[in-house]
Amino acid sequence: MNVKARKEILLIALGGNALIRKGQAGTVSEQFENLKVPIGQIARLSRDYRIIITHGNGPQVGNLLLQQECCDAVPALPLEILVAQTQGEIGYMIESTLDSELMELGID
């Protein structure tokens, strides 16, 4: 019986400020661009480790809260819903960028 050695687990935390750099407006295209370097490094690390990625969302949820407060035409959403929205948004950006990097490196 050929038993494959299990890879060690590596936990990586990306702060919300890793996606929005100082002086940037925080557009989605800027955030995707800012993810390329750290996600490229994570993709390469995945050859040797099982990866768990966690992330913050402070700047993103703050921006969404400001958007909510700027419009009286629609009901504002509570903060916990905005947190969930931005977590999903950032999770999608990470997953999409990671998938592209893994395909480029030929990693399943």
Which residue stretches match the model-derived regions?
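N-terminal glycine-/serine-/threonine-rich phosphate-binding loop
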Residues: 1-57, 63-69
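Ligand-binding beta-strand-loop-alpha-helix segment within the catalytic cores
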Residues: 70-108
